[in-house]
Amino acid sequence: MNIDNASNWDPQALGLVPMVVEQSGRGERAYDIYSRLLKERVIFLVGPVNDVTANLVVAQLLFLEAENPDKDIYFYINSPGGSVTAGMSIYDTMQFIKPDVSTLCIGQAASMGAFLLNAGAKGKRFALPNSRVMIHQPLGGFQGQASDIAIHAKEILSIRDRLNRIMAEHSGQPLERIEKDTDRDNFLSAAEAAEYGLIDKVLTRRDAA
């Protein structure tokens, strides 16, 4: 996780977005695939966590809560992580809204991606069998006068402590173990993530949930 803002990332840069055509009594209606899945209460975080992607996820979470505050939201994550502040805006919104947010790791959930995966509703956090999870402490690369560097170092340590305490709460692991295990990059398989408490179950088929 980087405490600085990650570079802007355009979801459209993933390439051509498929369109889905639906028939209705009024004729045909075309949706991009993500809008169609949003109707099914599915949200994607694909790529780095930054202000752009975080704002999109937060807006969709709030929209789906307004649509139906009693139905679960399904949050699919394939992310290498990114900005702590952007990620925390997603985390806080997940905790703030009324619907349960079920998280599912597809591909990878690293750094802030792993943090958000772990933050899903208890019993509703999943990963596909070949996905990877990585946890570590926040990164910082501030340059400047010694006094300013000291200020930023203190802030990084404060953020690290806050993130570790939240992860301990959601995973059920002792804070001391979280601190030890996030001191360096720590890679886990889906099964290891389940054993650790970052997720609740490894899914091999949809009906296994």
Swiss-Prot record:
Reactions listed under catalytic activity: Hydrolysis of proteins to small peptides in the presence of ATP and magnesium. alpha-casein is the usual test substrate. In the absence of ATP, only oligopeptides shorter than five residues are hydrolyzed (such as succinyl-Leu-Tyr-|-NHMec, and Leu-Tyr-Leu-|-Tyr-Trp, in which cleavage of the -Tyr-|-Leu- and -Tyr-|-Trp bonds also occurs)
Top-level class of the enzyme under EC nomenclature: hydrolase
Lineage top rank: taxon: Bacteria
Pfam families: CLP_protease
Subcellular location: Cytoplasm
GO terms of biological process kind: protein quality control for misfolded or incompletely synthesized proteins
Keywords from the named record: Cytoplasm, Hydrolase, Protease, Serine protease
Residues the record marks as active site: S111 (nucleophile), H136
InterPro entries noted in UniProt: ClpP (IPR001907), ClpP/crotonase-like_dom_sf (IPR029045), ClpP/TepA (IPR023562), ClpP_His_AS (IPR033135), ClpP_Ser_AS (IPR018215)
Annotated TM spans: none
GO cellular component, one term: endopeptidase Clp complex
Record EC number: 3.4.21.92
PROSITE patterns assigned to the protein according to its UniProt record, in alphabetical order: CLP_PROTEASE_HIS, CLP_PROTEASE_SER
Single GO term (MF): ATPase binding
NCBIfam families the record matches: clpP, PRK00277.1, PRK12553.1
Subunit structure: Fourteen ClpP subunits assemble into 2 heptameric rings which stack back to back to give a disk-like structure with a central cavity, resembling the structure of eukaryotic proteasomes.
Entry's family note: Belongs to the peptidase S14 family.
Role of this protein: Cleaves peptides in various proteins in a process that requires ATP hydrolysis. Has a chymotrypsin-like activity. Plays a major role in the degradation of misfolded proteins.
Designated name of the protein: ATP-dependent Clp protease proteolytic subunit
Biological source species: Dechloromonas aromatica (strain RCB)
Classification lineage: Bacteria, Pseudomonadati, Pseudomonadota, Betaproteobacteria, Rhodocyclales
